[in-house]
Design a protein with these regions (language model features):
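Active-site-proximal alpha-helical scaffold in enzymes
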Residues: 82-96, 144-147, 152-155, 161-195, ...
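Conserved catalytic cysteine-centered active-site region
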Residues: 2-9, 41-84, 104, 113-177, ...
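Conserved small-residue
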Residues: 15, 33, 86, 107, ...
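Acyl-CoA/ACP chain-elongation machinery
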Residues: 186-232, 265-279, 304-311, 326-376
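Short, well-ordered amphipathic alpha-helical segments that serve as non-catalytic structural scaffolds
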Residues: 82-93, 147, 246-248, 278-293, ...
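Condensing-enzyme catalytic core mediating Claisen C-C bond formation in acyl metabolism
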Residues: 10-14, 37-42, 219-299, 411-412
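ACP-dependent fatty acid/polyketide chain-elongation machinery
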Residues: 1-71, 93, 249-261, 349-363, ...
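Flexible, low-complexity linker/loop segments at domain and module junctions
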Residues: 1-13, 97-102, 294-296, 373-412
């Protein structure tokens, strides 16, 4: 997907909203990124239950005013996080909700898992108290499309509304698909992003795979350590990220402030294995995103989940695509952990905040980096610098690979 063309077909980012373990305001999150401050904490109940992995990057909206009962009764945390992030994004974009009450406005919000808690809670109630005590609205709270559906109902969205469910690329796919719909002339504005909730049983399942970090429970802020020699798995996380995407014509017509242009999007499937990342697939998605030409990116926000295999395969992909001229890159997961289907959206927002504020966040590697990263331009400590073009990479189970290319807006 290339972005250059008429104002109607060019796609720009005009609003950002986030719910994360780093905070729920853009300035708080940007400050945490710049300071290298981790949002990962130990979860005491997981220690008590004997989980091997006892750390998480847990988001919270407890300090945020709830929605009306009319809407809250249909929301689990996946939808709730997404709806708050969407509200923040619309406020940031200065876009009146009335503008969404049109078949030209949509919501595409990815989620890798959905709201598992609702299934478990309903089953527990039915088993312990009887079937007649089961809450009536479990299905809309738990269905895989709950995030996009709840946002559509909350804001009266009249256009496209659906949820990409493609593991850890779900949020990136939402951004890419939204951009494609706008570019094709099917939508004028789309709320796009991803959301994921934490649940004990979801953690248990990843723990059973040996996918999660378990060696740093006593030092949780060091547990997610992309590219470290002693990394031992990813740190599960939760939260949401929503971007307001508009056609350039729509944004200019209302005098919107523009963060960036979606300059490219790449998506592909690698068939090397269900849970095995593979450099050729990651590289293919990157190439598709970059196929419109233009300058080499100044910065790459890597997926780098802090897994022994995933980090190295992505390094191989970077070398394959850029050769000896790999751009500066870092992984923000060292501070946030891995929020699964929300990661692509949150990391696009992190990248745009760095672009806005003129810095590149460092990577929480620890003292000893993997030999595979030797000689590569990994940014280990936060540094000031202008980002004109950035690439954000995502990949996940099932071989799904995605990349989003973002150009800083210069008013042209």
């Amino acid at each position: 997907m290339t972005a250059f063309g008429s104002e109607a077909s060019r796609v720009v980012v005009t609003g950002l909203g986030i719910v994360s373990c780093l905070g729920n305001t853009l300035d708080d999150v940007a400050a945490a990124l710049r300071a290298g401050r981790s949002g990962v904490r130990r979860i005491e109940t997981w220690r008590q239950r004997g989980f091997r992995s006892q750390v998480a990057g847990a988001a919270s909206v407890e300090s945020v005013a709830p929605f009306s009962r009319k809407h809250e009764r249909f929301m689990g945390d996946t939808a709730r996080f997404a709806a708050h992030a969407a509200t923040f994004a619309l406020d940031d974009a200065r876009l009146d909700a009335d503008a969404l009450r049109s078949p030209r406005a949509g919501a595409i919000v990815g989620s890798g898992i959905g709201s598992m808690a609702e299934y478990d809670d309903a089953m527990a109630i039915a088993t312990q108290r009887g079937l007649d005590k089961t809450p009536p609205y479990v299905v809309p709270k738990a269905m895989s499309s709950t995030a996009s559906a709840c946002i559509a109902q909350l804001f009266g969205i009249g256009g496209v509304s659906y949820t990409p469910a493609s593991a850890c690329t779900s949020g990136a796919l939402a951004i890419g698909h939204a951009a494609q719909l706008i570019r094709a002339g099917c939508q004028d504005v789309v709320l796009a992003g991803g959301s994921e909730a934490l649940h004990d049983n979801m953690t248990l399942m990843f723990d059973a795979m040996g996918a999660l970090s378990s060696a740093f429970n006593d030092t949780p802020d060091c547990a997610s350590r992309p590219y470290a020699r002693d990394r031992d798995g990813f740190v599960i996380a939760s939260g949401a990220g929503i971007l307001v995407l508009e056609s350039l014509a729509h944004a200019r017509a209302r005098g919107a402030r523009i963060y960036a242009e979606v300059a490219g999007f790449g998506q592909c499937t690698d068939h090397a294995g269900m849970a095995t990342p593979h450099a050729p697939g990651i590289a293919s998605a990157m190439r598709i995103a970059l196929e419109g030409g233009g300058p080499r990116p100044d910065y790459v926000n890597t997926h780098a989940p802090s897994t022994p295999l995933g980090d190295v395969e992505e390094l191989k992909a970077l070398g394959d695509v850029f050769g000896s001229d790999v751009p500066a890159f870092s992984s923000t997961k060292g501070m946030t952990g891995h929020p699964l289907g929300a990661s692509g959206a949150q990391e696009a927002i992190y990248t745009l905040l760095m672009m806005r504020d003129g810095f590149i966040a460092g990577t929480a590697v620890g003292s000893d980096a993997d030999p595979a990263v030797a000689g590569m331009p990994l940014v280990r400590d936060t540094r000031d610098g202008t980002i004109e073009r950035a690439l954000s990479i995502s990949f996940g189970f099932g071989g799904s690979c995605a990349s989003v290319l973002l150009d800083a807006w210069k008013g042209d």
